[in-house]
Design a protein with these regions (language model features):
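N-terminal secretory targeting signals
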Residues: 1-17
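Low-complexity, Gly/Ser/Thr/Pro-rich intrinsically disordered linker/tail segments
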Residues: 2, 10, 201-224
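Peptidoglycan-targeting cell-wall enzymes and recognition modules
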Residues: 12-35, 39, 63-178
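Amphipathic alpha-helical segments that form the core helices of the histone-fold
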Residues: 37-48, 58-63, 200-203
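Short, mixed-charge amphipathic alpha-helical segments
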Residues: 45-50, 164-167
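Surface-exposed patches in mature extracellular/periplasmic domains of secreted proteins
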Residues: 48-58, 71-75, 189-199
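Acidic helix/loop microenvironments that form the catalytic cleft of cell-wall polysaccharide enzymes
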Residues: 62-66, 147, 193-208
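Proteins synthesized as precursors that undergo proteolytic processing into mature forms
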Residues: 174-176, 185-189
Length: 224
């Protein structure tokens, strides 16, 4: 068994993470850790995420984006009030939000209305052109790949046709590989340890920064 001192020595450069360390770093149950350890480990290795700080950042960001490694497909189960940011951004009108958003008496927004929201807010963006592209290429994977252009680019990186088979990104192996591809190719490792900059690359802003910071701190405590 590796001693604490040995782990610290190895953590200065490349080092392997075992399942117990991954579970603690990601803050997962034993069941989720068993499910995700192999896909995440293989994906990080494939795309050169080997530095302990980068591993901690990747696990933290993937954990936030996927609600703790549980959500692989973007949800549009929005309350009416939850659509306000889309209104401000000019992607929905107030009338559309009132017509499509979840009402107090509804537990879950019907899929037809979720689809309508996605097709409106992602229309003519990120390569989406056809009427149903917003829903078809909604966010999938541990780090939500979104939009036809990103699906195409990611598919090229993974050597699989994600334009024709977008649902593959909801499978664990591709969910992890797509996240590692994004993290590596979008320049996240150029800002090793810079939570703010990496969050902007992944999110386009700083949404959920406190949760990302908490996750990163926990992961660093275990891995670095």
């Amino acid at each position: 068994m590796e001693s604490k001192g040995q782990h610290r020595k190895n953590s200065r450069g490349k080092h392997n993470v075992n399942q117990s360390q991954f579970q603690k770093a990601a803050g997962l149950s034993a069941e989720l850790a068993a499910r995700w350890f192999q896909p995440v480990s293989v994906a990080m290795k494939e795309f050169g995420i080997t530095n302990p700080v980068d591993k901690a950042m990747f696990i933290a960001q993937a954990g936030h984006e996927s609600a703790g490694f549980t959500l692989l497909v973007e949800s549009f189960n929005y309350r009416i009030a939850g659509l306000v940011n889309f209104i401000r951004a000019g992607r929905l009108t107030a009338d559309q939000a009132n017509a499509l958003g979840r009402r107090p008496e509804e537990r879950v927004l019907p899929i037809e209305r979720q689809r309508a929201i996605a097709n409106l807010v992602y229309s003519k963006r990120m390569g989406n052109n056809a009427p149903g592209d917003g829903w078809l290429y909604r966010g999938r994977g541990l780090i939500q790949i979104t939009g036809l252009n990103n699906y195409r680019d990611c598919g090229n990186g993974l050597k699989v046709d994600l334009v024709k088979q977008p649902e593959l990104l909801a499978e664990d192996v591709y969910a992890a590989r797509s996240a590692a591809w994004f993290f590596a190719t979008k320049g996240c490792m150029k800002y090793s340890g810079d939570l703010m900059q990496v969050t902007k690359i992944i999110n386009g802003g700083t949404n959920g920064l406190e949760d990302r910071r908490d996750r990163f701190g926990k992961a660093k405590t275990v891995l670095v």
